Regions:
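Conserved catalytic alpha/beta core of Sir2/sirtuin-type deacylases, generalized to analogous enzyme cores
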Residues: 1-120
Length: 120
């Protein structure tokens, strides 16, 4: 499958193809806005540590597992009322340590969410 050139977003200044902001190389943007969002996320985690929390992972792979996957596993193991749900077509893996408070669904995330919304 080939994507037509006109569908590829381009930089408005130089015309270069844009890329996703992934922590994969030196192009990752970690600016003031990123740090503000990280601070809000840390605050959310701090305020909800002793409450019922669902760590819901949608299609997260192993490109940068230290950002989402591993912290979710660690918090699920450490927090008494945390539950981990992983929906991933190919990698719905659950560590042995948290299997009793987790669910892994090996299906397309869109299909699962549509089923949840329609009560199927």
């Amino acid at each position: 499958m080939r994507i037509p050139d006109y569908l590829i977003p381009r930089c408005p200044h130089c015309g270069a193809p844009l890329s996703m902001n992934l922590r994969a190389d030196s192009t990752f943007v970690e600016d003031k806005g990123w740090h503000a969002a990280a601070s809000r996320y840390d605050d959310f985690l701090r305020r909800h540590k002793n409450l019922k929390v669902l760590f819901w992972e949608l299609g997260t792979g192993y490109n940068t597992p230290g950002i989402i996957k591993y912290p979710f596993w660690q918090m699920t193991a450490a927090w008494p009322d945390a539950f981990y749900a992983c929906i991933n077509l190919e990698q719905a893996e659950i560590p042995l340590e948290i299997q009793n408070k987790s669910i892994g669904i090996s299906k397309d995330a869109r299909e699962v969410i549509e089923n949840l919304l329609t009560g199927v």
